[in-house]
Amino acid sequence: MKPYQRQFIEFALNKQVLKFGEFTLKSGRKSPYFFNAGLFNTGRDLALLGRFYAEALVDSGIDFDLLFGPAYKGIPIATTTAVALAEHHDRDVPYCFNRKEAKTHGEGGNLVGSELQGRIMLVDDVITAGTAIRESMEIIQANGASLAGVLISLDRQERGRGEISAIQEVERDYGCNVISIITLKDLIAYLEEKPEMADHLASVRAYREEFGV
């Protein structure tokens, strides 16, 4: 685990974005942990979040031309990541996001920001079922652009309804890499360093045994 990944886990814990306990997911599964990126909700949170996304992006080495944030959660993420790339990595990258409803007046259309072209890095909070990615792919392809990769905050590394995860489905269907700031594996490595979190470690390991990929 890299220093920025450990720092991200601590940031998420401090903000109550990452919690341990017993949570029922939309799928009906009982999970020993829960991640709610919507709680990164202040100016300082966003500034820090962008730095972690930018770090993971640079670390991945994937070439891309533009950041795309799918509405709605992806919009602030794309914005803060673009700022962090400029301020901390000297990379001035264009960004773009979509509207859920196409505008009929003014400049019209359903895209805001830079022109959607070239190799696109899609940024979002998490991938649950991959629906937002599929909707975004329609927009990207309609504009003649290509998907360079997808960047999310957490990869839960668990099976969907079949034998592979929603993330593996996206990688298979679109031939792109999905990268994340942290994975379930990183989370377990962090818990292993914390004797006071031994109970949580046991339940997270058991969950991975049952649902992991």
Swiss-Prot record:
Q: Which residues form a coiled coil?
A: none
Residue numbers binding orotate: 34-35, 128, 156
Q: What is its EC number?
A: 2.4.2.10
> Is Transferase there in the keyword field?
yes
Q: Which cofactor does it need?
A: Mg(2+)
Q: Which reaction does it catalyse?
A: orotidine 5'-phosphate + diphosphate = orotate + 5-phospho-alpha-D-ribose 1-diphosphate
Which Gene Ontology cellular-component terms appear in the entry?
Answer: cytoplasm
Under the GO molecular function aspect, what terms does this record hold? Answer: magnesium ion binding; orotate phosphoribosyltransferase activity
Per UniProt, 5-phospho-alpha-D-ribose 1-diphosphate binds at 26, 72-73, 99-100, 103, 105, 124-132
In which pathway is this protein known to take part?
Answer: Pyrimidine metabolism; UMP biosynthesis via de novo pathway; UMP from orotate: step 1/2
Q: What class of enzyme is it?
A: transferase
Query: Pfam family example for this protein?
Result: Pribosyltran
Task: List this protein's GO terms for biological process.
Answer: 'de novo' pyrimidine nucleobase biosynthetic process; 'de novo' UMP biosynthetic process; pyrimidine ribonucleoside biosynthetic process
The record's listing under Gene3D superfamilies reads: 3.40.50.2020
* HAMAP family in the record: PyrE (MF_01208)
Question: What is the annotated quaternary arrangement, including any partners?
Answer: Homodimer.
**Which family would the database say this protein is a member of?**
Belongs to the purine/pyrimidine phosphoribosyltransferase family. PyrE subfamily.
What role does this protein play? Catalyzes the transfer of a ribosyl phosphate group from 5-phosphoribose 1-diphosphate to orotate, leading to the formation of orotidine monophosphate (OMP).
Give the protein name, as stated in the record.
Orotate phosphoribosyltransferase
Organism the protein comes from:
Enterobacter sp. (strain 638)
